[in-house]
Amino acid sequence: APLMKLAVKNKGAEKIALVTDSMRGAGMPEGKSILGSREKGQEVIIEGGVAKMPDRQSFAGSVATADRLVRNMYQLGERSIEEAVYMMSLTPATIMGIQEQKGRIAKGYDADIVVFNADIQIQQVFINGQQY
């Protein structure tokens, strides 16, 4: 948490993107999962929110979901919810050069919206205005 706070303090929310490279086990119950393809992938174990190799001697990949990153930045990084969402939406869109269609709720933008509750638990998802 101290590193998160320092990074945002020095760079600002507009220069920090929250990004996840989570593997297939993200958001799934603890237990066995697969890293890579089903046919040629490596079996891993998800425990305590971490993916580990079966011998539990090394990490096997990230299981951090986007909502978890927003929650961590808000709670542990002590940033406002607006800043945390900005770092997950508009900052990455700007980095990718698609800030004219993604990253905001505004006329002319893609209606990609994630609705969450006060605990930052996902309640609804809309992609191009279509609820899923």
Give the role of each language-model region:
Residues 3, 7-20, 25-109, 113-115:
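His/Asp/Glu-enriched, well-ordered alpha-helical/loop segment
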Residues 119-126:
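Short, Lys/Arg- and Gly-enriched loop/turn segments at beta-strand edges
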